[in-house]
C-alpha cells in the first residue's frame, strides 16, 4: 500500500469516527433539551442568544464540511473550516467567562446554569469533530 493510500484510509477511518461522534453529541443535546423542558428550566434571553449564535456557527461549519466531503481530496481547503472553528472557540470562551460571572451574581438558577453549560460545551465539541473531518480529508490526522 502506498503512503498516499495509507494516509487516505487513515483519514477515512478518522472521518467515520468523527461523524459518528457528531451524531452522538447531537443525541446528547436532544436529551439535555428534553430534561430542560421536563424540569421547566428557563434560559435568559442572553443564554438563548448565545446558544443561537453557536448553532449558527455550527450550521456554517457543517455546510463547509459537507461541501468538502463532495470534493476530490486535492481540492479541499481547510482555511474556511479553521476560521469557523476559531469563531466557535472564541464564542465558547466568551460565553464561559460570562457564565461564571452570572453564576456568581445569581443571574439564573443552578439548574439553568448546568443545562446551559452542558449545551454550550457540547456545541463546541461538535465543532471540534467537524474540523477533524476536514483535517481527515486533507491528511492532517
Task: Explain the meaning of each model-derived region.
Residues 1-141:
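Cytosolic, long alpha-helical scaffolding segments
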